[in-house]
Structure formats: structure tokens, C-alpha cells
Amino acid sequence: YAEIFFRNVRASGVIPQISVIMGPCAGGAVYSPAITDFVIMVDGTSHMFITGPEVIKTVTNEEVSFEDLGGASTHATKSGVTHFTAVDDEEALELTRELISMLPSNNLQKAPVLPTRDSIDRTCDRLQSLVPDNPKEPYDIIVAIEETVDDGAFLEVQSEYALSLIHI
């Protein structure tokens, strides 16, 4: 695994590294996705852990499921290792394509400029009533982001993790 880690480290900050986990990923192979830029997991079929439930049961006498130990939901909500959770393999690949379309190919290129249907002088009427008069009242900042970005295109990273934050 040393060669894989070496390549991850050399590529870090140079090219985008995206790991798409569409099944079990166990043992030393788990370390590589954990140090890539983005991890996409499929809910219900993806699992990442160093050692499986059987070994945990033998060593600690604790019974834990594959899902609780290293499923997509666990890594999306508790460990923060996964950045996106897909409902199936097809959606995982769609997310990967969408993510790649937003990133430069390497550190020497600028981020892609995508065409927009939004007018340069459009108004954002929903913003007028979004922030309440009472500063102690909450409001949905995602609405502000969606109203502000072109075509309402917003892909939130780690939307299930640290819910008091917006990850952009």
C-alpha cells in the first residue's frame, strides 16, 4: 500500500482525486480513499472499514453491522469521510461527472467556466424576504446561495455532516 499512498500524496493539490466506493472496501485499501479530495459512497452497498464485523465481534465481543461500522450513512454523518452519498451506482457516477465538470483538471488550470441562462441583471426577489427582522430567528442560508449562484446550481459537499455548517 505504500506505493498507493505515495501516489496519493504526490497527486494531492495537483490533480483532483475522487474515490467512488460502490461496494466493500476493507483493510489497507481504505486508507487511500480517506486521503483523496472527494469520496462518493453508495447507500446500502458501500462499506469502508479497516476490519470487518466478524473481527470486531471476536476481539471486543461487540456486534456491529457492516452499515454501522462503515456504511455510507456512517461516513456521511459521523466520520465525515464521505463527501457525497448516492442512492445507487448510477447516481454515484452521475455525481462524479457533475463534480468533474466543476473542477480544473490540474493545479495549473482555472476552474471551468460554464454557460448560464441567467441574465446578468436578474433580480433575486426571494432574498428580499429571506432574512427575518428578528436577528435571533434562523433562516435557510442555502436559499440565499441557490438564489445567488448561476442557474441555482449548487452542489453542497458533505451535506449530511456537521449540519450547522454549509460545506461549499
Descriptions of predicted regions:
Residues 1-108:
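Conserved catalytic cores of soluble enzyme domains
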Residues 23, 58, 95, 111, ...:
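A sequence-level detector of short, solvent-exposed, charge-rich linear segments
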Residues 88-138:
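Terminal amphipathic helices with adjacent charged low-complexity linkers/tails
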Residues 150-164:
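Flexible, glycine/threonine-enriched loop-and-boundary segments that flank and lead into catalytic domains
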Residues 166-168:
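Conserved small/polar residues in nucleotide/adenosyl-binding loops
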